Amino acid sequence: MMRPWTILIASSWLSLAAASASASACAAKPSVAAEIASIDHDNCEHGPNSRGCWGDYSINTNYYEQAPDTGVTREYWFVVENITMAPDGYEQHVLAINRSIPGPLIEANWGDEVVIHVTNNMERNGTAIHWHGIRQLNNNAHDGVPGVTQCPIPPGGSYTYRWKAEQYGTSWYHSHFSLQYSVGLQGPMIIHGPATANYDEDLGTVMLQDWSHVSPFAMWWYARVPSGPPSLSNSLINGKNIFRCTDPLDKNCLGTGERSEWHFEKGKRYRMRLVNTGLYSNFRFAIDGHNLTVIANDFVPIEPYTTDNVIISMGQRYDVIVEANAPEDNYWLRAIWQTSCCPNDYANDTLGIIRYDPQSTALPNTTHPALHYPDNCDDEPAEKLVPHVKVDAGPPARTDVFNLYRHTYDMPRGFMWTLNDTYLWIDWSKPTNLLVAENDTTIFPPNYLLYHTPDGPNQWVYIVFNDISERNRSHPMHLHGHDFFLLGTGEGNFTKDSPLQLKNPPRRDTASWPKRGYMVFAYKTDNPGAWLIHCHIAWHSSQGLGMQMLERPGEMTYTEDEDQALHQTCQSWNKFYESPEQYIQEDSGI
């Protein structure tokens, strides 16, 4: 068990921070979301001018405490395999689901049950699929993290995931096995529900992904040395882009790439669901000639605000509404690389096209001021991310501090990120859930980085992260099984004088920890399980930047089918992993 550094926060300090936040809230002007909240939503029909309605529920429903039970099951069958594709016109080996990148859309309504059968037809890789942002209330067995909630699915094996859509909005699913999702093993998710602003049409997900023509597995060696990994080759929007061939002798460069396109009709309002599924890319999203009204971050509806661009880090989502009020023409949709965060060979060429005339084939001749904005490796300003359903952070049962370092070890490990001097390194064959199920929890391996939450239900835990690594990189931290209550971020180390926002703080499941700074977050122990928290820069999670939150292990329960699946998958995995053809673990495993 990892030993955090525990601190006690004085009640007077908390009261001061709460009072300050409360005073700021009182001074706020009425918002569009407040107007929607004032409408009687009971049993009203969800439509273009009543998006806050949802039958017996509404945008005002506290989704942490109640959700519909539709009785509807949405069922999907996924086949994972090694194939050759050319998403941007450059042919290469990829990992794909149902032979597509991104994989199939998972679509459900708030309150539906979702069942996904995953078959692994890869040749030498295990896998497991994580449903990013899905709360998995009392359902830890289906979180899809190898070495934590299950053993990997071996080649030729299958696994069934089952979960309820208890929140609504936009997300994605991806492999949580090493670097697999950066090679294509990912796809979009939409959970339909109410919204904090009205719109006419839902255009679905806009998936922003960095892309490399050299396999990230081949680049992994370079990621472990001081110079870091080389620049990536390109980026994709919804699995498409153009790559400009420069070597006429390169037979892999087919030149068949194309841009993703959308059609706007003058006067309509469109919902677009932005998802950053990148390996280590920060994007600034913008559409030339149009503003964006932001209505949700991750799975949390927020009070709408209007901007001309949105910063989106790895693992994050923003739902935006775009009004088609520009002159009828063609416009660039942009995912602008923040190159001071991470290099890319074609940083300004991640483009889609908005067309008012669907018959047009002309390229846009437009620009955007965001091309000249300073790079931003952090998040949208916290003061803009105001949750519509107001929830305050309770007083902490315990507050613990974790300091981030960067240590050098002998190869093959090289550079590793550590929290309180320990890096995460799991054993695929001995997942935490298996040890809990078999009551073998007396001694967890130190590199499992197990953080035991306070005993008892509904205790508030405060976590302080300090970055003292002296590295020039922020970290998008993703928490499984919960939303962060983001109490504060800032430069330098956290001190007792650092301000905290306790009244309705921003909530989301992926938040950026500033470079050489601190992040303080809270969550309530209302969901038994082993929950991973990790950096969503894939290089960094592979280099050990993460830990496990072991929450109320005595209340972790399994159905007979879940227990059987856990043990059978581990038996099959161990049999495969002992064979000469096995894939050797070369990173943290997640």
UniProtKB/Swiss-Prot annotation:
Transmembrane segments: none annotated. Keywords: Copper, Glycoprotein, Metal-binding, Oxidoreductase, Repeat, Signal, Virulence. One of its GO terms (molecular function) is copper ion binding. Glycans are attached at residues 82, 98, 125, 291, 348, 365, 420, 439, 472, 493. PROSITE patterns: MULTICOPPER_OXIDASE2. Disruption phenotype: Impairs the production of oosporein. Residues 1-28 form the signal peptide. It comes from the Eukaryota. InterPro entries: Cu-oxidase-like_N, Cu-oxidase_2nd, Cu-oxidase_C, Cu-oxidase_fam, Cu_oxidase_Cu_BS, Cupredoxin. Coiled coil: none annotated. Residues 80-194, 205-358, 427-554 form the Plastocyanin-like domain. Pathway: Secondary metabolite biosynthesis. Pfam families: Cu-oxidase, Cu-oxidase_2, Cu-oxidase_3. Induction: Expression is negatively regulated by the global transcription factor Msn2 that binds the stress-response element 5'-AGGGG-3'. Oxidoreductase; part of the gene cluster that mediates the biosynthesis of the bibenzoquinone oosporein, a metabolite required for fungal virulence that acts by evading host immunity to facilitate fungal multiplication in insects. The non-reducing polyketide synthase OpS1 produces orsellinic acid by condensing acetyl-CoA with 3 malonyl-CoA units. Orsellinic acid is then hydroxylated to benzenetriol by the hydroxylase OpS4. The intermediate is oxidized either nonenzymatically to 5,5'-dideoxy-oosporein or enzymatically to benzenetetrol by the oxidoreductase OpS7. Belongs to the multicopper oxidase family. This is Oxidoreductase OpS5. The lineage of its organism: Eukaryota, Fungi, Dikarya, Ascomycota, Pezizomycotina. The gene is OpS5.
